[in-house]
A protein has these predicted regions:
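Short, acidic, Ser/Thr-enriched surface-loop or helix-capping motifs
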Residues: 3-4
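Hydrophobic "anchor" residues
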Residues: 8-9
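Short catalytic-loop micro-motif centered on adjacent basic/acidic residues
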Residues: 12-13, 39-43
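Active-site beta-loop-alpha junctions of metal-dependent nucleic acid enzymes
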Residues: 12-34
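A structural signal for short coil/turn segments at secondary-structure junctions
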Residues: 34-35, 116
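RNase H-like two-metal-ion nuclease catalytic core shared by retroviral integrases
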Residues: 42-44, 50-55, 64-87, 97-106, ...
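C-terminal domain-tail junction helix/linker
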Residues: 60-62, 87-154
Length: 154
């Protein structure tokens, strides 16, 4: 899960399958940690179009924005993130088991969130940007105008 506001990677689930129930569990964990988003943008994967996920969004009053089929540019933040993750983790190593993938993913997320500058964030990392906004050194509007929103990894 990627936060559109500051491009922070909030969760990456490493598993052989990703049913809607697991998606809901992960989103609930993120909500408990960071608060409820106004919306969640996803592709049209089966885990996101399932009744369970749709009902969860309705129950939680979270707008579920589904990108149009064949239009990955409507989900550009996550597409770019997935590319970085694929290049830096999945394509960079040969893993023997999922635990090794999880460990490499933890290291990647820490680096991405704390060290990786984003042009759209004034060349700050996601955490640097969030800290600057929270300390009053920046206003969110001075850098971008996105509404708080989560983008789900597909």
């Amino acid at each position: 899960i990627l936060d559109d506001y500051n491009r922070e990677s909030l969760s990456i689930n490493i598993s052989y399958s990703f049913p809607s129930e697991k998606v809901i569990e992960i989103v609930e964990q993120v909500i408990e940690w960071r608060g409820k988003p106004e919306s969640i943008r996803t592709d049209n994967g089966t885990e996101f179009i399932a009744h369970a996920f749709t009902n969860f969004c309705i129950r939680e009053k979270i707008e579920h924005i589904k990108i149009q089929k064949g239009k990955p540019t409507q989900n550009s933040y996550i597409e770019r993130f997935n590319r970085s993750y694929r290049e830096d983790v999945l394509d960079a190593y040969i893993f023997e088991d999922l635990n090794q993938v999880r460990k490499a993913t933890e290291i990647f997320m820490d680096d991405y969130n704390n060290e990786h500058p984003h042009e759209s964030l004034g060349d700050k990392s996601p955490i640097e940007f969030l800290n600057a906004v929270n300390c009053g050194k920046l206003t969110a509007q001075s850098t971008h105008t996105s509404l708080p929103q989560l983008t789900a990894i597909h």
